[in-house]
A protein has these predicted regions:
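Long, low-complexity, Lys/Arg-enriched
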Residues: 1-117, 130-418
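Conserved SAM-binding loop
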Residues: 121
Length: 418
């Protein structure tokens, strides 16, 4: 497995060589390559002090380690809000862009599971180190690591000090004193971090769109405060929009692809806003018998959502009418397969029901944090009396009935006919 040293750097390129020295000193894996996130000014410092002067080669030689190729292509310059590389992030907009860039970079380098990351938060502005640390918490894997480097007094930030040399090397201080580089000590402090990669929406982990750091954090925070969620169900366009009572600008929309699955979602959302005494209609069908009543309700709901009137007096007849509606399923080939499968079974089986629920959860998880999905995706929500279960969502409760497990669904869910 290859190792990449990923660091944020400000005006002190020596952080790179100091970190490498520290890794060697404690017997850690020697990196194969280096990636540095910095500003335009920091990039010039790196080119002058690490690439042109090349103390990196000297370090590798003294430690008996393989040379690490480091070129200008390995320097990732943070763009401002206008997309132009920044000399220094000063505005609020530039800091937002900086956060997005750092988090996106970490997302990208952690996509390859055959490459481990060692992140250094020893350099750069405080905000840069925070964003790198938090990005590692969001995207870091069990084999990734993070550190800060501690350099003995007097040597830190000295322009001519890069690592403790084997031979004496005198360094002149501003007050006229001298220090010997060979006397310096470097300590690499391991930084433990909570790994929250499981919370991140699946699409953000897989694709190269820029990560909106603020939105991602707000969505994760919203998942920790279910009472603040507001869920708009757009019945015709098969969309749910998630907003927050505390963050008016936050709004994320997810579309459900299969109209048959969407019909079930709408039924369960409607179930969730009913009075307690009227809830508890939708349980997982028994494995021994297909559920005709549920199939009929879903068929009628699908027809209603698409402006159709069904005349059949049996599940088979209702499903046949839907299958014959070419306009309904032409753009949704999975819909025809779903309808035919239910017709062949004479209703909805327990396995089919579980597939519908799992597919809905997966589609929501593609764009939303896992903790948020737990409270807006269908799950076991009610007991036989229609009361909210103490533990809802994906945890299996014997005899539990399905709904949308928001704490006060009647106040949190609204339906929009679009």
């Amino acid at each position: 497995m290859k190792t990449t040293l990923l660091a944020v750097i400000g005006m002190s390129p020596a952080v790179i060589t100091e970190t490498l020295y520290g890794l060697h000193g404690r017997g850690d894996v020697w990196p194969d390559n280096i990636k540095v996130i910095t500003t335009a000014v920091g990039a010039q410092k790196l080119i002058q002090q690490l690439i042109n002067a090349n103390p990196l080669h000297q370090l590798c030689h003294e430690l008996g380690k393989p040379d690490i190729s480091f070129t200008a292509a390995d320097i990732l310059v943070v763009p401002g809000s206008d997309g132009v590389p920044v000399a220094d992030a000063r505005s609020t907009e530039d800091h937002e862009a900086l956060a997005n860039f750092i988090v996106t970079t970490v997302r990208d380098v952690t996509r390859n599971n055959s490459e481990r990351i060692h992140a250094s938060i020893a350099g750069g502005r405080k905000t840069m180190t925070f964003y790198l640390g938090y990005a590692m918490s969001l995207f870091g894997r069990r084999f990734d690591s993070m550190s800060h480097v501690l350099v003995s007094e007097g040597y830190e930030n000295h322009p001519e000090f890069f690592f403790p040399t084997r031979s004496p090397q005198l360094l002149q201080l501003r007050d006229g004193r001298t220090l010997d580089a060979s006397d310096a000590t470097i300590t690499l402090a391991d930084i433990p971090f909570i790994r929250q990669r499981h919370l991140v929406p699946q699409l953000l982990k897989e694709f190269r769109e820029t990560v909106n750091f603020r939105e991602l954090v707000e969505l994760i925070n919203l998942g920790e405060d279910p009472a603040a969620i507001r869920l708009s169900v757009y019945t015709q366009s098969r969309q749910v929009k998630i907003t927050s009572v505390y963050e008016p600008q936050l709004a994320v929309t997810v579309q459900i692809s299969n109209p048959w699955h969407w019909a079930l979602y709408v039924l369960l959302a409607e179930e969730s806003i009913r009075d307690e005494a009227d809830r508890g209609s939708y349980g997982r069908p028994q494995s021994s018998k297909a559920d005709e009543a549920l199939a009929a309700e879903m068929a009628l709901k699908l027809a209603e959502l698409n402006g159709l009137e069904l005349l059949g007096d049996s599940v088979s007849a209702l499903l046949t009418e839907l299958i014959e509606q070419d306009d309904l399923w032409t753009n949704h080939p999975n819909l025809e397969r779903s309808l035919v499968a239910v017709k062949e079974k004479g209703g909805i089986t327990g396995d089919q029901f579980s597939t519908y629920i799992n597919t809905l959860q997966t589609e929501l998880a593609a764009k939303l944090p896992a903790n948020l999905v737990l409270v807006i995706a269908p799950g076991q929500t009610f007991d036989e009396q229609g009361e909210l279960l103490a533990v809802t969502g994906r945890i299996k409760n014997r005899g539990g009935f399905y709904g949308i497990p928001l704490p006060d669904a009647s106040q949190q869910i609204r339906f929009v006919v679009d």
